[in-house]
């Protein structure tokens, strides 16, 4: 039997605006993030459109998933963590959150070695205070065949 995916948690003043699979975003550039597998994170030109609002995600190349949050205050030096299945340490980086501005925390399956089924947890902390925690259940790529980030196929 599968373990129940934990419900999303949002701290005081944090709204989880969207959770799920989103349209492949336009990448504006990258930002160094040495404590991640790739060593950088992608920066988006604008918040993407979420098309499948769910926490079950198929492990397929090109699929984008994550969350869009809005905070009621500016928060500097937020520690962002991604826990992948079987990892002893999370991938992490720091970012700033601006009051009232939607902030994307996402992941795109770009490489075969990233296609890891199991629970993927996205968290953020302001010091020791948890801002959010959202767990996605990544399923084998053969499952949920209709779920895609290619929005051209959906129009």
What are these regions (language model features)?
Residues 4-119, 123-126, 130-135, 139-155:
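Contiguous segments within soluble domain cores/interaction surfaces
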């Amino acid at each position: 039997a599968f373990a129940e995916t934990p419900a999303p948690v949002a701290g005081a003043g944090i709204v989880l605006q969207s959770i799920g699979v989103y349209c492949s975003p336009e990448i504006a550039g990258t930002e160094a993030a040495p404590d991640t597998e790739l060593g950088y994170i992608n920066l988006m030109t604008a918040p993407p459109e979420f098309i499948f609002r769910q926490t079950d995600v198929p492990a397929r190349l090109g699929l984008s998933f994550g969350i869009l949050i809005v905070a009621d205050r500016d928060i500097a030096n937020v520690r962002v963590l991604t826990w992948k299945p079987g990892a002893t340490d999370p991938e992490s980086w720091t970012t700033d959150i601006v009051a009232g501005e939607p902030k994307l925390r996402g992941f795109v399956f770009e490489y075969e070695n990233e296609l890891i089924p199991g629970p993927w947890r996205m968290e953020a902390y302001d010091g020791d205070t948890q801002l959010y925690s959202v767990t996605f259940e990544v399923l084998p790529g053969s499952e949920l065949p209709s779920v895609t980030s290619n929005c051209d196929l959906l129009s």
